Regions:
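Gram-positive cell-envelope targeting signals
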Residues: 1-46, 163, 173-176, 185-188, ...
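N-terminal, intrinsically disordered, polar/charged segments of Gram-positive cell-envelope systems
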Residues: 1, 20-80, 84
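Short, solvent-exposed coil/turn segments at beta-strand boundaries
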Residues: 94-95, 112-115, 156-158, 177-184
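Secretory pathway targeting signatures of secreted, lumenal, and periplasmic proteins
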Residues: 77-132
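Solvent-exposed loop/turn segments at secondary-structure junctions
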Residues: 127-129, 167-170, 190-195
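Surface-exposed amphipathic alpha-helical segments
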Residues: 183-213
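Signature of long, low-cysteine stretches enriched in small and polar/charged residues
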Residues: 138-181
């Protein structure tokens, strides 16, 4: 009888131990290992051109003459600081034209102009000579049937080196503005099928361009 009691006691102890192990709270989740985010080299950093840079001392809106008619345009700002370039600003009819960034350049075109029949593009070229680049820049915009360099010209209050070119479908104008470490390019493009008022408005915007820094 004593042996039976001892065996029952041992069995009870084993059951209790097993029960304790089963009911023991599970360990909390392991803390995630600390990860180091990859650091992009300078050339691979996502660019932010539009809306960046120092805020210029210019009004938020300005009346701009467009082909003899006054238009109220809104201030657009940007900076090419990530490319070693200056800040810039200009006035644009934001109710008609959209502002976008592509391949390190800013493009202004109508929302309903899917074919890009008229647009204004502003870019920065680190280390480039404005006068030299004026002779070749338009080759980046298609097969140029004919081209003419204009020498030193004015774009609003800025001095630039100009060029004009023609492709099968479009006419192009380029203005290369010297800066401290390179030059800024301003390119106007318009197709013969696009209303002249589109080009006139974009040219008026380009003539309000200011560069700082």
């Amino acid at each position: 009888m004593a042996v039976v009691v001892v065996l029952l006691a041992i069995a009870l102890i084993v059951v209790n131990v097993a029960d304790i192990r089963i009911r023991r709270p599970a360990a909390g989740p392991e803390a995630p290992a600390e990860t180091t985010l990859p650091q992009f080299p300078f050339g691979d950093e996502p660019e932010l051109i539009l809306g960046s840079g120092e805020t210029p001392a210019r009004d938020a809106e300005q009346v701009v003459p467009v082909d003899g008619e006054d238009k109220t345009m809104q201030l657009v700002t940007g900076s090419f600081a990530q490319r070693g370039g200056p800040d810039f600003s200009l006035y644009l009819d934001k109710g008609v034209f959209l502002s976008t960034e592509l391949d390190g350049k800013c493009c202004f075109a109508r929302a309903d102009d899917a074919s890009m029949d008229a647009y204004l593009e502003i870019g920065y070229h680190m280390g480039a000579d404005a006068q030299t680049l004026a002779g070749s820049l338009l080759n980046d915009y298609g097969t140029i049937a004919s081209m003419e360099t204009l020498g030193e010209v004015k774009l609003g209050g800025l001095t630039a080196y100009g060029a004009k070119g023609v492709t099968v479908q479009r006419e192009l104008e380029a203005y290369l503005i010297p800066t401290a470490n390179g030059c800024i390019s301003v390119v106007l493009c318009h197709a013969g099928t696009a209303p002249a008022s589109w080009y006139d408005s974009l040219l008026a915007s380009a003539q309000t361009l200011q560069i700082t820094g």
